[in-house]
Amino acid sequence: MKVLSLFNGMNTGRQALENVGIKVEKYYSSEIKPYAIELTQYHFPDTIQVGDVTKWREWDIDWKSIDLVLSGSPCQDLSAAGKRAGINGSKSSLFFTFIEILEHIKSFNPNVLFLQENVGSASKLDVGIMSRALGVYPVRINSSLVTAQLRDRYYWSNIRVKETMFDLVTDIPQPKDRGVMFKDVITDGHVNCDKAKCLMEGTISKNSSKTPNSFSHQEYLKKRERIGMLSLIYEENNELRVKTNTKQGYDIVTENDCIDLSFPTSTTRRGRVIKGKSPCLMESNNNLYSYKNGIVRTVNQIEMERLQGFPDGYTSILSKSKAGSLLGDGWTLPIIEHIFSFIKPI
């Protein structure tokens, strides 16, 4: 199979194809982030990097040979976490570049397969626009079925379709629920605070870092305090609490809960304590915390990998921030494996 992957990110598509036993002859990757390219070439050095997607007409590709096109066009303008500029926003409008490329390939190979992914919080209007452009309506799958992460996504594909009375729809069934919970992805070394940031209101005395007075630790706390994070978590009546905009005014944190401190300055925020699962990883991922053995700390790199279904250490050649950026922007590996399992032999 010859594959063209647009907005390739951390190369989840290639890994998923390998995992389900589909032989890849050539894999073209369009990606501009240097650390994403570094990770891709580390795992799959035969990947052919073609560069900026907006310069696709300059690419040296045998277009008629492409069997599968993958696209995870930027979703920032569609996401509930973004500014809701919509499909015509400066980033999400790259979807139409994907459409141009797909139509170009179809002129040589009408049977080319495709997969397009985008956020579940996209508006009905934008979903309709994308569906009409692709000629098929999406299936909606939450990664919580196969991982410990709540990650709601739309997937458009002609890998398997069915006709309804009015439309053609993506006919990928829901994957079986694996029952993976947040507590299942927390690493055994949870209480080793030399490698974890412990966050509590004010200075941390109980169950704090072994080096609470170190310069880096204090600077980290100061940064979090400046944006309001430390004042959100506090102890009272032998309970760990997180401030929320509810009648009670707080949520109680219990063992193995995930704490979401995104939008720390919001005065209307609810649901900061998530039971059982983690909220969706995002590109800026430093706002998720785990609570275990009296310790509150940021999720570590291995835990982020597990939340997206990757093997431990998959991103170990990168820093935590760079790995988190790719994982937060990327696809959930077991979901893509599930979709690709329906590809018929060529």
Feature locations, PLM:
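A general structural motif
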Residues: 1, 24-26, 46, 63-66, ...
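Catalytic phosphate/metal-binding cores of nucleic-acid and nucleotide-processing enzymes, i.e., regions
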Residues: 320-321, 331-337, 341
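SAM cofactor-binding core of SAM-dependent methyltransferases
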Residues: 4-55
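Class I S-adenosyl-L-methionine
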Residues: 56-68, 75-280, 296-297
